[in-house]
Amino acid sequence: MKTRSTTKVQRRFDKRLFEAGQQCLKRLYLDYHEPVEEQESEGRRIMSETGKQLLQLARGAFARGVEVEGKTIDQAADKTQQLIAAGSVFALFGAAFVADGCEVRTDILVRQKDGSLDIFEVKSGTKVKGRYLTDLALQAIVIERAGHKVHGVYVLYLDKTYKHTGGTDYSPKGLVKSADVTERVRRIQPRVAEQLAAFQRQTKDDSALDLPTGTFCTAPFPCPHLANCSKQEPEFPLRSFPDLTREIERELHEEGIADLMQLDEARPSLTFRQRRTLQCIKQKETIREPFVKEELLHVEFPLHFLSIATTTEALPRFVGQKPWQALPYAWACETLTAGGAVTQSGFAYADKDDPRPEFAQSLAKQLASGGMLILWNADSLECVRSLLEPLAADKQAIRVILARPHLDLQRLLESGLFHPNLLGERGLAATAKAICGIDAPTEQDVFDEDSVLRAIQKASTPRTRAATKEKIAADLRSYAQSQAAMLLALWRLLSDKQEAAAEAAAKPAKKTAGPRKQLPPTPVED
């Protein structure tokens, strides 16, 4: 067992440490004694900025609010106590409380006439989640231990039915909903108090360092210690097992199983995917179910290998857009005719204006010739479908796109293709590399989700030059085109169209949704 010396200066327990304990006791111990600086992804950074924007927006609805100042949490806590005692302030922003080795800060705190307090937590989600309630229960516990009475607890969150009217101004009354969660928080307070005491004790117990990795390492967010912990993992760790539930994972951990090679294929309760996964890693070869080839050949030419690129933002920007509604900004298509000819086409928009009308019109024009769509994930068509209501003038174009039959390649391969290097969650790039040996382009400026988000953010900035925006649009289109090319390569290889592939490769490429197709039922073991 590894040992660690305890921290010389005792840290107070806060929201971050409590969340770490809920995720993994090993993470809790390491975060307490050996915290590491997290590499924030572009998506998390944007979410953080959006959260700050939404917080300021929500605070604007509370009159006579005062920001609690203080360079340290102790100074802020002292200032909070003074303002509450004075009784002249209606709302406090960023109020701080310290008690029993714990510290919390509230988004918005409202003082009632009798001196009791209402807690308001601002969230960017569109519904009240369990972890919101746990966070609020922790706040209520510390506030009451600091000598105050909590009167009510509320969550302010985004109304998913809100339709933006355009521009950058938002009305808190229309965008934000309020939920009274006082009773729900009261019910879980005893359990949260017990967890808090247990977590505080756990920081003094280094036995947590022997805990194995698991699905909790990446849920709800990736653990900052995962890169180091994964060095001790076997080649096929248990957390990469498909269809793995927390209950089954806990059961296997109790049996001392952390390596898929330890699992028996005949073990009861294993799903079809799990059995096939064990077979492919033990046989060290790809297993392809017969229906995969059949499905890939049961197509309608021309085939449009289509990549639809979208981004999702909490706060809508364009007319009729709703919170968290996906926004399409690019598409790329490799169209294959029955004779083997391939044409390339695409569209990308990089500016502050609404990309949706031109996106819909350009893609509809490309698909007007008929044929079938081959997509990595058909959920992208739901993004197109969501345009019907806000883009009344473009409904005909949108219906042209949705009228095309389609095949969801990810769903097909997850149910019928098993490869030793494709465990757990599969992406298009990882699948193309494992099956076709294709590496995703990394030499260009836009090559993954984070770089896409950075590019879109930069393009929407007013000060960005026109020439820079043109380059960003070209990079976004190139990124989408690489995704479409991977789809075509996968189809050719898995449908055994080698001759067609060779013929198409010899010819230079020319530059230039519909009812969901049902897959065959998952095979059942004899």
Q: Where are the regions that the model predicts?
A:
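Metal-dependent nuclease catalytic cores that hydrolyze phosphodiester bonds in DNA/RNA
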Residues: 1-116, 246-274, 278-280
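Acidic, Mg2+-coordinating catalytic module of metal-dependent nucleases/exonucleases
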Residues: 166-235, 246, 255, 431-505
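Conserved DEDDh/DEDDy metal-dependent 3′-5′ exonuclease domain
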Residues: 90-94, 99, 103-107, 119-122, ...
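Terminal, non-catalytic protein-protein interaction segments that mediate quaternary/complex assembly
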Residues: 240-261, 265-274, 342-371, 380-388, ...
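Conserved RNase H-like, two-metal-ion catalytic cores of nucleic-acid enzymes
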Residues: 97, 291-366
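Short helix/loop capping segments that flank catalytic or ligand/cofactor-binding pockets
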Residues: 30, 232-233, 250-252, 261, ...
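Acidic, low-complexity intrinsically disordered tails
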Residues: 500-526
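Long, highly charged low-complexity segments
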Residues: 257-315
